């Protein structure tokens, strides 16, 4: 080409022959699986933009590239640039790893089989065999508008994050099979051609900030995995760099409006782009923009108690992980320490301790799958997932004995077992130890002004989960679906799991019956801690929330450790409201339906597990209580599927200016038979700041009280 100052490549894409199949070492295939076809030929790689317009030819190491370009030998300059990148060793990406498990290897191969692109584990055509949906049209082209029947918006959003591409890069590193490179080139070229950058603000799906951020992070990995391939040509390098810069420029131009995980992912991606591709002209600006966002948002994204403002442990862990990656990026590439605020270290340490205190003692049992609560838009974390994070936390803070205890599955001195209050996010933890046989209760009383359907926090009004001796007796209902505004069925599912009565808490209704989805929801989530006390034998927290304009829920939780272990809940509803108060309880999960018995006459329930790990629940009130069974639900995937479990509500009439008051006893036992439980109020009902109760369990009486 004879243009000295500009090098142009014209985009010209033709159809590629597709191929399919897995190797003998991949996920087993049934006999009716589609047989492999011929491998594709690589696309013609042309583009209409100038590579040399986006390069900083004065960057150290590009001297020969610059000389060849100045001499008008653009082909040679491009070839020299490719050699430079292939031999570059001083720029280090902390996320690189050739480790690939069997499932990930399968996803790398399925991307070649009828364009079966891995989106996430919730969107699989065959969940048992881990087979993603196919995006192949009848004419063998890719349908980027595809979404499975009934899927919410997340499928299309996450499809455009290209999560399968780095997996193909890892597969290439392990096999050096060129089919992975050819697939990557073909599919990415097709995506770029069919999904051009918007002329203005980000759209909702393809060029939404989180999608762009994730693509940038993935491409920084794919580039390194594939760059040694003979099919990684100088023309492809040009195509890749032009569109990588296009992504980073666009992301730096449109800062996400919310102060949450999406904005943080945007910032991290920009710092990665600017650091890992410093040869590009705008790299310093990308890096600075990303660091500025992080420094500005650190105290906004993280609340003073260490929890992130989404109030979701799932997103919290992801945010901490992104900042861990960022710190490693800065350390490995010897960037100046002052790029990030000195506050970040202290904020991150607090954030790691949130994860630690939210971890159930089952974490210390090999193979455990249920090791965390799942409040709000969150999912239960397994032992292995949590440990990977604790290893990173201990790396960031090597002198912290608590994080090292978690990293090593219990070697050393455990954290203390005192009450942990996270007052700014509304979470509270009571426990008696850190062994698998321990007891731990997590109380959630959300503090958030975001109550709309799209919010990650739910309308809980003071719910809880209770872990005892390896079993979660009150797991949260979970999340069944994300958003899809124009799909009534999807939105009904999302609203069912978000509604207040889907939690272990109190609602205000207008009838004695279970009312329509969302009709009894609180309209304000400003949970407040009003008291916290403890001694060697007992822990107490008292919280409240003015969830309705004329009805306030106050919940006291007494945890009696000695001489007999039990919990006493005092739930009170104050205000001028009239109607019916309903105290909901949702027990165990779908696998335990036959082990949960509702005791209607005793206003409670009990479990009948054969492992001698059971619970009796009994409630008492300041007036008559009616127990109504309720079809509870539980779901920890956003695949619009759920299981039914046992639940119930305890109903009292709410009269004007008269409080409703419940006492609920949770008593861990080996078997539920032959136990007698009673509880009564012994205080002056005219003084709402004074609570005194007597609890009698098997002829032993315990006096519990607090004064505000």
Where are these regions (language model features)?
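Bacterial N-terminal signal peptides that target proteins for export
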Residues: 2-11
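C-terminal motif of bacterial Sec signal peptides marking the signal peptidase cleavage site
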Residues: 19-21
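Bacterial signal peptide processing site
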Residues: 23-25
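Extreme N-terminal leader/anchor segments
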Residues: 40-127
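CBM-like, beta-strand-rich accessory domains located in the C-terminal region of large
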Residues: 213, 485-708
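Carbohydrate-active enzyme catalytic cores, enriched for enzymes
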Residues: 303, 307-473, 655-657, 661, ...
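Cytochrome P450 core scaffold surrounding the K-helix E-X-X-R motif
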Residues: 474-477, 483-486
């Amino acid at each position: 080409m004879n243009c000295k100052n500009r090098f142009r490549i014209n985009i010209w894409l033709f159809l590629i022959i597709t191929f399919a199949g897995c190797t003998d070492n991949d996920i087993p295939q049934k006999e009716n699986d589609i047989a492999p076809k011929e491998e594709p030929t690589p696309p013609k790689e042309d583009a209409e933009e100038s590579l040399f317009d986006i390069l900083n030819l004065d960057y150290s190491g590009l001297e020969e590239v610059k000389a060849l370009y100045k001499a008008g030998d653009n082909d040679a300059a491009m070839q020299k640039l490719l050699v430079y990148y292939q031999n570059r060793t001083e720029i280090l990406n902390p996320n690189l790893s050739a480790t690939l498990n069997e499932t990930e290897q399968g996803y790398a191969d399925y991307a070649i089989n009828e364009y079966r692109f891995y989106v996430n584990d919730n969107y699989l055509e065959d969940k048992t065999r881990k087979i993603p949906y196919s995006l192949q049209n009848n004419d063998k082209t890719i349908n980027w508008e595809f979404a499975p029947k009934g899927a919410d918006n997340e499928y299309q959003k996450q499809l455009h994050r290209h999560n399968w591409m780095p997996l193909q890069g890892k597969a290439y590193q392990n096999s050096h099979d060129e089919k992975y490179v050819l697939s990557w080139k073909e599919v990415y070229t097709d995506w770029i051609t069919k999904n051009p950058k918007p002329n203005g603000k980000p759209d909702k799906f393809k060029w939404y900030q989180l999608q762009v951020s994730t693509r940038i992070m993935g491409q920084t990995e794919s580039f390194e995995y594939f760059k040694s391939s003979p099919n990684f040509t100088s023309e492809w390098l040009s195509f890749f760099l032009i569109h990588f810069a296009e992504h980073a420029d666009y992301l730096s131009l449109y800062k996400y409006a919310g102060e949450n995980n999406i904005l943080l992912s945007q910032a991290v991606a920009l710092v990665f782009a600017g650091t890992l591709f410093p040869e590009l002209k705008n790299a310093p600006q990308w890096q600075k923009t990303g660091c500025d966002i992080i420094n500005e948002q650190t105290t906004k994204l993280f609340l003073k108690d260490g929890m992130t403002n989404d109030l979701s442990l799932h997103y919290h862990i992801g945010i901490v992980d992104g900042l861990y990656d960022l710190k490693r990026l800065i350390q490995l590439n010897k960037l100046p320490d002052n790029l990030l605020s000195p506050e970040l270290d202290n904020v991150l340490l607090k954030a790691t301790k949130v994860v630690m205190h939210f971890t159930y003692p089952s974490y210390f049992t090999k193979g455990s799958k249920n090791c965390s609560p799942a409040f709000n838009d969150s999912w239960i974390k397994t032992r292995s997932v949590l440990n990977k994070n604790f290893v990173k936390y201990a790396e960031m803070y090597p002198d912290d004995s608590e994080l090292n205890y978690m990293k090593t599955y219990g070697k050393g001195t455990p954290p203390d077992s005192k009450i942990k209050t996270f007052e700014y996010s509304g979470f509270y933890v009571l426990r008696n130890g850190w062994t698998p046989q321990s007891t731990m209760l997590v109380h959630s009383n959300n503090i958030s002004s975001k109550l709309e359907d799209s919010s990650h926090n739910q309308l809980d009004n003071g719910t809880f989960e209770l872990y005892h001796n390896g079993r979660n007796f009150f797991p949260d209902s979970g999340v069944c679906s994300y958003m899809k505004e124009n799909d009534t069925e999807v939105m009904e599912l999302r609203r069912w799991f978000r509604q207040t009565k889907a939690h272990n808490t109190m609602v205000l209704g207008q009838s004695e019956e279970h009312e329509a989805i969302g009709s009894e929801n609180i309209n304000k989530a400003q949970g407040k801690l009003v008291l916290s006390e403890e001694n060697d034998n007992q822990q107490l927290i008292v919280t409240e929330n003015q969830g309705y304009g004329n009805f306030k829920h106050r919940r006291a939780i007494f945890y009696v450790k000695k001489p007999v272990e039990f919990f006493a809940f005092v739930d009170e509803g104050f205000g001028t409201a009239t109607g019916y108060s309903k105290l909901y309880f949702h027990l165990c999960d779908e696998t335990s339906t036959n082990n949960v018995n509702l005791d209607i006459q005793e206003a409670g329930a009990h479990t009948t597990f054969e492992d001698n790990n059971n619970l009796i629940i009994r409630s008492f009130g300041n007036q008559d209580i009616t127990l109504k069974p309720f079809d509870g639900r539980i779901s920890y995937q956003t695949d619009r599927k759920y299981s039914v479990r046992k639940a119930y509500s305890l109903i009292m009439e709410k009269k004007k200016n008269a409080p409703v008051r419940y006492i609920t006893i949770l008593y861990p036992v080996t078997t539920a038979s032959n136990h007698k439980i009673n509880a009564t109020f012994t205080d002056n009902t005219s003084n709402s700041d004074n609570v005194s109760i007597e609890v009698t369990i098997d002829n032993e009486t315990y006096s519990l009280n607090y004064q505000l």
